[in-house]
Amino acid sequence: MKRTKIVCTVGPGTDKFGILEDMMRAGMNVARFNFSHGSHEEQAERMQMVRDAAMIVNKSIALLLDTKGPEVRLGLFKEGKVFLEAGQQFTLTTDDVEGTKELSSVNHKGLTGDVSVGDKILLADGLVTLTIDAIEGNNIVTTVQNSGEIGNRKRVAVPGVALSLPPVSEQDEADLRFGCQEGVDFVAASFMQRGKDIVAIRRILESEKKDIKIIAKIENAEGVKNIDEILEVADGLMVARGDLGVEIPAEEVPVLQKLMIEKCNNLGKPVITATQMLESMIQNPRPTRAEASDVANAILDGTDAIMLSGETANGSYPVEAVATMTRIAEVTEKAAIYDSYSRAREDEEMTTTSAVCLASVRVAQNLGAAAILTCTESGHTALSVARHRPDCKIIAVTPHEETIRRMQLCWGVEAIKGHEIINSDEMVKQAITGALGTGAIESGDLVVVTAGVPSGATGTTNMIRVHIAGRVLLSGNGILRKSVTGNVYIAANHKHNYESFKDGDILVVGTMEPELMAIAKRAGGIIAVEDGYTSDSAIAGITYGIPVILGAKNAHEVLLEGQEVTIDGERGKVFAGIANAR
């Protein structure tokens, strides 16, 4: 099972029937909706398609709304596009004009006040560079540094300049309120430059009474400079390498990627590495070697999730792109030596939750546990465990569907549905039973359970327990390929008075005496010391269609009256408690 999550952008390439289901089966965890394109009606239709597909494949898929953000763009050109020659003069104006080879409008009215003579302006994702020669009223006069084509609505970037754009445009606000109505799980906030930008978005979400998690997209030098204050108020980060590589030198992006991932790991906040990860697969069925290395290195850096953009939204091979990413993740995770404490430093001032989660990782590591089970309301406990990157599985048991979906962005966490309970014993039992039921753990696995008591409150994680799930108590020869769980009833303890026997009890006998046949008929199963497929115990099991374990020599010494056990006729095993005896 891959531990790195995959975010897939949906679009025309995923509209064909069955594509989304196949992408989910291939490893998709989160559906991204790019609100730079498409109407609300189109986005709502695709969101419903994702929900329907997730129901078909029985998988939880989170929805992520990616805002257009405060962008500066060119206006419309008379011919739709023009070709600029190196050395020519080209003017940008805040007036509304039709674009020509010499002039274009821009949508940011304050641009003339933000820039200075000598600044560089990049057009069309950095394909054309301009140098500012003069600022004359509403006009910015520039010289074209290199030839290239530009066209309608192409992006305008001014590296190193903090533009006076509002963090949330009118369109963004409308999109956010639409997302609240549609029940999205995450908002990817584009072009975040400072902490107050995140606060402005959160204010809109809270006005709709929605607790939607905000993933800050770092796409310019100002965002990089203020990364720490942004992370104070954001719920996670997206390393948006495409726009970031336009705003700052491309050679600096790999180092910044590692820096931002490390900061998120240390804080226990999810981080997505995005843009051009398998770009060639938009048109080709296989990635380049460089792309495969890029994906693998992001995983080794510690990213929680890796993202596909045009590869799935508009590409010819969306399913193959997801499957390729899954294979790269699985191979990288197996080869990588994940030290449990290399990804996150211990806090100088630890909270109770962080201390208990770190301790649970250490206990699991030392005991060789198969899984850490976290009983969680909001998912915070699972995130706190995941920040230490344990070698074993992390299984979050929660009563809330929205928490299950949020965990789809968290490294290594598998979320399953539970129900609200207060008693700690019931909490542990539910976690183990749920994990066994989904096949996340197997009978006999040692697991570490962490939770908060009393339950129901966020941030109260204060309990660690070590359990063996479905511990094997006895082995013998099985009759009938079925399993059953019930309470132990030891016939020898009742001195020929069996009135206390309840339907479904597990009858324990030395030999099947004739007087026991009446209650054997009502038993869930039989555990017998006697052996042999022609023994009376075997005949009783076959006659009444119930599983029998024969030759359980130490049954009377090992089992306790009333103990809950599971007997597995196929494997000839008796497990303690409820076991997923498949």
Language-model features, listed with the residues they occupy:
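N-terminal intrinsically disordered, low-complexity, charge/repeat-rich segments that act as generic
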Residues: 1-65, 69, 291, 306, ...
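Short, ordered loop/turn segments at secondary-structure junctions
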Residues: 10-13, 28, 35-38, 67-70, ...
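Acidic, glycine-rich flexible loop/linker segments
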Residues: 70-169, 173, 434, 440-495, ...
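Conserved alpha/beta-domain cores
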Residues: 3, 8-13, 42, 161, ...
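Phosphate-interacting basic helix/loop segments used at nucleotide- and nucleic-acid interfaces
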Residues: 41-44, 50-57, 101-129, 195, ...
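Expand to "…catalyze enediolate/carbanion chemistry for C-C bond making/breaking, isomerization
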Residues: 1-12, 16-17, 24, 39-44, ...
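Glycine-enriched alpha-helix->loop->beta-strand junction motifs that scaffold or abut catalytic
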Residues: 25-30, 181-185, 205-210, 232-237, ...
